[in-house]
Amino acid sequence: MNRRRRIYEGKAKILYEGPEPGTLIQFFKDDATAFNKKKHEVIDGKGVLNNRICEYVFTHLNKIGIPTHFIRRLNMREQLIKEVEMIPLEIVVRNVAAGSLSKRLGIEEGVVLPRSIIEFYYKSDELEDPMVSEEHITAFGWANPAELDDIMALAIRVNDFLSGLFLGVGIQLVDFKIECGRLFEGDMMRIILADEISPDSCRLWDIETQKKMDKDLFRRDLGGLVEAYSEVARRLGIINENEPIRGTGPVLVK
């Protein structure tokens, strides 16, 4: 593999310079982190599964007119993406009480919310991603009101799609996180979905058993993360029953 210029490295992914202007290569690592990197482990095969699941979801979103940065998958660990100017927000959509919402408001985990709730968090490891309001976002210039409207519209459409997708394979979409960016095309700019959608960024519960099929398995030391991610991929038809769940793929360029 040719050496490429590294643009950015995060907790679970690395961005490299792309083959053409306006493109990047997104590499999915096997690193699992929680609680702002206070907990860290390398889990063989996680990056491969997240790449495949993200490819599947983003391909379908693109097809139904929800714009994403995804262009195509390059190999088991990498995908070609459009370069965007990232908006420093995590957008969380909640359908069922779980995680920090349950702790913050004293709602029992598993309670279906009266309606889907959208929350915003400012991306900052140093500040541990504090929750912010729409007023904070516009006042500090992280996004203007029109961009915020576009982000919320994207979040609602993604929630509708993902809820139906997972329901069809016996999985409840409890909540999920997305990130968005500004895509510049000539004199035009539009807000599109970026980052990833995978079991790393969603809470997924088996409808019949309520078994967790997401990164909470790692957060709570329940084990079986790769097996759960593999089961999600199998139910979606991404991998077959006999396909191996572990694999190194390309070697990470240092």
Curated annotation (Swiss-Prot):
The molecular function GO annotations come to: ATP binding; phosphoribosylaminoimidazolesuccinocarboxamide synthase activity
Pfam families reported for this sequence: SAICAR_synt
Pathway involvement of the protein, from the record: Purine metabolism; IMP biosynthesis via de novo pathway; 5-amino-1-(5-phospho-D-ribosyl)imidazole-4-carboxamide from 5-amino-1-(5-phospho-D-ribosyl)imidazole-4-carboxylate: step 1/2
PROSITE patterns on file: SAICAR_SYNTHETASE_1
Q: Which InterPro entries match?
A: SAICAR_synt/ADE2_N, SAICAR_synt_PurC, SAICAR_synth, SAICAR_synthetase, SAICAR_synthetase_CS
Assigned EC number: 6.3.2.6
For this UniProt record, the keywords arranged alphabetically read as follows:
ATP-binding, Ligase, Nucleotide-binding, Purine biosynthesis
Q: Which reaction does it catalyse?
A: 5-amino-1-(5-phospho-D-ribosyl)imidazole-4-carboxylate + L-aspartate + ATP = (2S)-2-[5-amino-1-(5-phospho-beta-D-ribosyl)imidazole-4-carboxamido]succinate + ADP + phosphate + 2 H(+)
Is Flavoprotein among the key words of this record? no
Question: Could you state one GO cellular component term attached to this entry?
Answer: cytosol
What GO terms in the biological process aspect are recorded for it?
'de novo' IMP biosynthetic process; cobalamin biosynthetic process
Entries under PANTHER family matching the protein: MULTIFUNCTIONAL PROTEIN ADE2, SI:DKEY-6E2.2
Tell me the protein family, please: Belongs to the SAICAR synthetase family.
Q: What is this protein called?
A: Phosphoribosylaminoimidazole-succinocarboxamide synthase 1
Source taxonomy: Bacteria, Pseudomonadati, Pseudomonadota, Alphaproteobacteria, Hyphomicrobiales
